[in-house]
């Protein structure tokens, strides 16, 4: 397990954790057949001219990804949980609770959403912070990796009370930037003030094997 805890202003902390072999091949197999039948929707770059990955948004209360956004896109419309996903979410929640994150002052939420991303060759996710308008200022985020490995990078940015947009990189603390390799069946976790002071990105895939990620959060 990798754990990176970074002290932040106002006595807060950004918490990052990586746990390899968090789920088993057998547990993944229960999902794979269903995942293979999902009709994923393309996600594009900022100019909506190039596909950068494919996705499907699931929310147990049928909520749009972020109702406070000005523009609406089909890819962020809610889909109903299927049985295998609901069972998998329960499994993930129970297993996370075994790691005693409460000792770090972090509680495991009752997840109510899952964003499933599919990455093909040359796909990626650009640097971003998960919007506080949908998930609050200090969300607990758990990302499961299935299939091809990937590299995730975290970069320090300035925070001015909200995390709209990318903001400017914190050049005085760039030395804190770091990256992790995400192996199949692993989970990476972001919590505390991580979505205030850090962007994260999944770098461009350079192989032809498909990668699937499932990101669990509690939408407010």
Roles of regions detected by a PLM:
Residues 1-220:
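Non-heme Fe(II) oxygenase metal-center motifs and adjacent flexible, charged/small-residue loops
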């Amino acid at each position: 397990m990798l754990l990176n805890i970074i002290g932040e202003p106002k006595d807060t902390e950004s918490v990052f954790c990586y746990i390899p072999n968090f789920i088993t091949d057998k547990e993944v197999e229960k999902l794979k057949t269903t995942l293979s039948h999902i009709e994923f929707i393309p996600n594009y770059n900022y100019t909506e001219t190039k596909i950068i990955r494919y996705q499907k948004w699931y929310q147990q209360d049928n909520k749009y990804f972020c109702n406070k956004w000005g523009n609406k896109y089909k890819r962020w419309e809610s889909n109903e949980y299927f049985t295998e996903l609901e069972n998998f979410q329960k499994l993930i929640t129970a297993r996370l609770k075994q790691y005693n994150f409460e000792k770090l002052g972090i509680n495991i939420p009752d997840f109510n959403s899952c964003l499933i991303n599919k990455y093909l060759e040359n796909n990626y996710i650009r640097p971003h912070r998960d919007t506080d308008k949908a998930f609050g200022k200090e969300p607990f985020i758990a990302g499961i990796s299935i299939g091809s490995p990937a590299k995730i990078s975290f970069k320090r940015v300035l925070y001015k009370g909200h995390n709209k947009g990318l903001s400017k990189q914190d050049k005085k603390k760039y030395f804190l930037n770091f990256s992790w390799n995400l192996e199949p069946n692993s989970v990476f976790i972001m919590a505390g003030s991580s979505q205030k002071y850090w962007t994260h990105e999944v770098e461009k895939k350079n192989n032809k094997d498909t990668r699937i990620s499932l990101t669990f959060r509690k939408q407010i």
